[in-house]
């Protein structure tokens, strides 16, 4: 007999019949992903909050993005873990809507942050003289506000007003909806709208901005190499270090963006294509793609650990308890060049 999620069989979702060993393996893997996500992003949050040297416009955007990733690991992933391993939802229909809305909101907020970080890097690298004037604290606050508010309004509005299956109500209630389930369902219109809002438009902005940065950085490198070394050797040494630092930051943020696109691209492509293919994508594959997307929030702190020396030094100070020492917040995590 098939296992069911609800005691009223004719309206219940079907529970998976995986063995206990398979379930235990899945739970172990997903718990590892969740813990890695929480610990990694918490280190980023604490580092930027604690050390005054890290209180820069770019780092506040990174801090906000790490908060998004931390909340995804804290509020979304644990419930998704149970749903994925059991193929059942035990937390009620209202909380299903809250969970789905929060999931869409935080996933969308990540790429919004990355878009604004790319714009910040554009001015830092391509217009450094006016960077501090253009990317002041007010501008950063507006960017952070938009990164949180727009995804929140979009996600909660769409799910609680049930706009996500508008135009496909018959398919949803006849073939998808059942007691004990919490699947993410999109109609043709809502699928395209989600793809455009959460992925394509902000992702395209990022790609265009980083390509522009690449062209300008390449041109700057050519001009420096053509300059008279005897007359400008001192200037080159100072600017070379500064530009090397900026190029490294751009490279790091570019990798962060690339990881996001690689992780979320399969899910968003399936989201926009599935309604046009008459919903042929099985729920298990959809779960796999969702978790593959979640991995983006796990990988971001790892990118910082590999490419940012300040992250490694901050981590070392935390592990040895040095952040509890007096004036540890004023510790120099990296060398600052005087102007």
Swiss-Prot record:
Changing residue 224 to A: Reduced activation of G(s) G alpha proteins in response to agonist-binding. GO terms for cellular component: endomembrane system; endoplasmic reticulum membrane; plasma membrane. Changing residue 260 to A: Reduced activation of G(s) G alpha proteins in response to agonist-binding. Changing residue 268 to A: Abolished activation of G alpha proteins in response to 3-iodothyronamine-binding. Keywords: Cell membrane, Disulfide bond, Endoplasmic reticulum, G-protein coupled receptor, Glycoprotein, Membrane, Receptor, Transducer, Transmembrane, Transmembrane helix. Changing residue 307 to A: Reduced activation of G(i) G alpha proteins in response to agonist-binding. Changing residue 83 to H: Abolished activation of G alpha proteins in response to agonist-binding. This is Trace amine-associated receptor 1. Disulfide bonds join 5-178, 13-88, 96-182. Changing residue 178 to S: Slightly affects G-protein coupled receptor activity. 2-phenylethylamine binds at residue 103. Changing residue 220 to A: Reduced activation of G(s) G alpha proteins in response to agonist-binding. Changing residue 184 to P: Decreased G-protein coupled receptor activity in response to p-tyramine-binding. GO terms for molecular function: G protein-coupled receptor activity; trace-amine receptor activity. Changing residue 253 to A: Reduced activation of G(i) G alpha proteins in response to agonist-binding. It comes from the Eukaryota. Changing residue 290 to A: Reduced activation of G(i) G alpha proteins in response to agonist-binding. Does not affect activation of G(s) G alpha proteins in response to agonist-binding. Residues 1-24, 82-96, 162-188, 274-286 are extracellular. The lineage of its organism: Eukaryota, Metazoa, Chordata, Craniata, Vertebrata. Residues 50-59, 120-139, 212-249, 308-339 are cytoplasmic. Glycans are attached at residues 10, 17. One of its GO terms (biological process) is phospholipase C-activating G protein-coupled receptor signaling pathway. The chain crosses the membrane at residues 25-49, 60-81, 97-119, 140-161, 189-211, 250-273, 287-307.
């Amino acid at each position: 007999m098939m296992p069911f999620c609800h005691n009223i069989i004719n309206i219940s979702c079907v529970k998976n019949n995986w063995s206990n060993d398979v379930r235990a393996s899945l739970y172990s893997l997903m718990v590892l992903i969740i813990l890695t996500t929480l610990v990694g992003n918490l280190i980023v949050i604490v580092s930027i909050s604690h050390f005054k040297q890290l209180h820069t416009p770019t780092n506040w955007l990174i801090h906000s993005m790490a908060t998004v990733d931390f909340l995804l690991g804290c509020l979304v992933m644990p419930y998704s873990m149970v749903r994925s391993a059991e193929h059942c939802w035990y937390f009620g229909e209202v909380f299903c809507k809250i969970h789905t809305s929060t999931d869409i909101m935080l996933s969308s907020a990540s790429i919004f942050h990355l878009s604004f970080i790319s714009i910040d890097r554009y001015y830092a690298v391509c217009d450094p003289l006016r960077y501090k004037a253009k990317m002041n604290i007010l501008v950063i606050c507006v960017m952070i506000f938009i990164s949180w508010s727009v995804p929140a309004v979009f996600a909660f509005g769409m799910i609680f007003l049930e706009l996500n299956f508008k135009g496909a109500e018959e398919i949803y209630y006849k073939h998808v909806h059942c007691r004990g389930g919490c699947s993410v369902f999109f109609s043709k219109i809502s699928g395209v709208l989600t793809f455009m809002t959460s992925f394509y438009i902000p992702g395209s902005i990022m790609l265009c901005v980083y390509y522009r940065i690449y062209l300008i950085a390449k041109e700057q490198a050519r001009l420096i190499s053509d300059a008279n070394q005897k007359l400008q050797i001192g200037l080159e040494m100072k600017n070379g270090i500064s530009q090397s630092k900026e190029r490294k930051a751009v490279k790091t943020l570019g990798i962060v963006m690339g990881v996001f696109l690689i992780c979320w691209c399969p899910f968003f492509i399936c989201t926009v294509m599935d309604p046009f293919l008459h919903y042929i994508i099985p729920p298990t594959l959809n779960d796999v793609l969702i978790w593959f997307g979640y991995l983006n929030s796990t990988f971001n702190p790892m990118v910082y650990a590999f490419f940012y020396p300040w992250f490694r030094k901050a981590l070392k100070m935390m592990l040895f308890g040095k952040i509890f020492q007096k004036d540890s917040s004023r510790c120099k995590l990296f060398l600052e060049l005087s102007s």
